[in-house]
Amino acid sequence: MAHPKRKISKTRRDKRRTHYKASAPKVAVDAVTGEAHLYHRAHWHEGKLYYRGQVLIDNTEEVEA
């Protein structure tokens, strides 16, 4: 089984890891609701599930009088 011949120093290890950075998620604004949401994700707004400006699920309850 392969194993390292020498110990890699903390400095050398950390230099290698400088390129691994956290990036901020891409945020879109829905044209219909004006709600900010992640790209390619459906989002809830006032009891309705929206995706690309269309209502997918309508969970608003109508009160019968």
Curated annotation (Swiss-Prot):
Pfam assignment, any one: Ribosomal_L32p
Domain of life: Bacteria
Region feature Disordered, mapped onto this chain: 1-24
GO annotations of cellular component type: large ribosomal subunit
The UniProt record lists the keyword Ribosomal protein: yes
UniProt keyword annotations, A-Z: Ribonucleoprotein, Ribosomal protein
SUPFAM superfamilies: Zn-binding ribosomal proteins
GO molecular function: structural constituent of ribosome
Keyword match Repeat: no
Classification via InterPro entries: Ribosomal_bL32 (IPR002677), Ribosomal_bL32_bact (IPR044957), Ribosomal_zn-bd (IPR011332)
GO terms for biological process, alphabetical: translation
Biased composition (Basic residues): 1-20
Family the entry assigns: Belongs to the bacterial ribosomal protein bL32 family.
Protein name, as recorded: Large ribosomal subunit protein bL32
